[in-house]
Regions:
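Short, functional C-terminal segments
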Residues: 2, 163-179
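A short, amphipathic alpha-helical segment
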Residues: 2-3, 158
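N-terminal secretory signal peptides and thylakoid transit peptides that target proteins
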Residues: 3-25
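C-terminal segment of N-terminal export signals and the immediately downstream linker at the start
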Residues: 7-8, 28-70
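Short, well-ordered alpha-helical packing segments
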Residues: 18-19, 31, 135
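Short linear motifs in low-complexity, proline-biased tails and propeptides
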Residues: 23-28, 163-165
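Glycine-rich, flexible loop/turn motifs
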Residues: 45, 119, 167-169
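Flexible, low-complexity segments enriched for small/polar residues
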Residues: 50, 54-163
């Protein structure tokens, strides 16, 4: 009968584990780099948001906010909301900026997007029904991390959307008082 607690076997197992983990992390890093998911600077007209975040956010706003007259009346309503989100992030802490960019990066990277959202293609090309289903799946997930991701994502999108004047008329808000 072999001794499974020998030091020789433990070292071998440790080396195998280390080699396997190194290969896995190296492959994930290479995939992220080749897929354009490596950290990059802000988009040309943005202070925090990256170029890869913009189409993703443009697709998520209608799914998060729901049907809104401003989406059909004002062709640049979503762009204005994205700009508002960028301004809000600009004045938040570096930690918050980093966490938001990590969340958006995770949703942009094909390796993580499919298993986490159920949408295997590009999120910017997904139908509103697919995006709503993904958001509901996160909201009702048994995993706390996905529920927190849902809550954070929706709070950010709602905060940015309802801070823009084009959203006010539909909810009966006349705007801030003139002083």
């Amino acid at each position: 009968m072999s001794d499974t607690t020998s030091a020789n076997l433990d070292r071998r197992s440790l080396l195998k584990l280390g080699l396997g983990a190194s290969l896995m992390l190296g492959t994930a890093g290479l995939t992220a780099t080749l897929s354009g998911c490596s950290s990059s600077g802000p988009a040309g007209n943005m202070a925090v948001l990256r170029e890869s975040d913009l189409p993703l956010l443009a697709a998520l706003f209608p799914a998060a906010v729901g049907p809104h007259p401003a989406f059909s009346e004002n062709s640049n309503a979503i762009e204005l909301a994205i700009a508002q989100l960028d301004r809000s992030l600009q004045y938040s802490s570096p930690f918050v900026q980093s966490e938001v960019l990590n969340l958006l990066g995770m949703l942009s990277m094909p390796l993580t997007r499919g298993p986490l959202t159920g949408i295997w293609g590009d999120l910017a090309q997904a139908s509103p029904e697919q995006l709503e289903a993904f958001l509901l799946r996160w909201r009702d997930s048994r995993f706390e991390l996905l529920r927190k991701g849902h809550k954070s994502l929706l709070q950010l999108l709602h905060m940015a959307w309802y801070a823009t004047p084009q959203s006010w008329a539909a909810v009966g808000y006349p705007g801030p008082p003139i002083i």
